[in-house]
A protein has these predicted regions:
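A solvent-exposed interaction/effector surface
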Residues: 1-155
Length: 155
């Protein structure tokens, strides 16, 4: 852990995601899935963080599924835009910040993290990821947000 960032190891994680040209409807589609718009009409507890980033010339938004689910037993989305996938385990360099989860706030902290990783000669293995932990009614100064990169790291 540096004074700017920490490196975390995450095991494989099951997610539900939407990839689109603009992310305006992504949250709504994911929320409908966990609210029962799936083949089992099953409601699923929302987990945090919600992650976002760039993928396939578009943008993705992801919800993590609770650990009781596997790719085999997770309810199948009824909306074809909603996909179930696995994020493979790996190491992630993370910088935390408060305030609004705005593009400007994310880009500012992503750049701080990117610069420090380059200074520390840490190899970045993917595009930046935005993680948000709080709903819109949480006061900005109380919000927890993160910018992260998948990195090459040894334990």
């Amino acid at each position: 852990k540096s004074e700017i960032y920490e490196v975390r190891h995450y095991k494989d994680r099951l997610i539900v995601e939407v990839v689109s040209r603009n992310d305006d409807s992504s949250f709504r589609k994911l929320f409908k899935y966990i609210s029962g718009k799936n083949n089992k009409s099953q409601e699923i507890k929302m987990t945090v963080p919600v992650t976002q980033g760039e993928k396939d010339n578009g943008y993705y938004m992801q919800f993590y599924l609770p650990s009781k689910f596997t790719k085999e037993n997770a309810p199948i989305p009824t909306n074809s835009d909603v996909k179930i996938s696995i994020i493979e385990e790996g190491f992630f360099a993370v910088i935390e910040y408060s305030g609004r989860a705005s593009d400007n706030n994310f880009f500012k902290h992503k750049e701080i993290l990117n610069k420090k990783l380059l200074e520390d000669k840490v190899i970045i293995k993917g595009p930046p990821i935005r993680a948000t932990y709080n709903g819109p009614f949480t006061l900005p100064m109380m919000r927890r947000n993160e910018a992260m990169f998948k990195v090459e790291w040894s334990k």
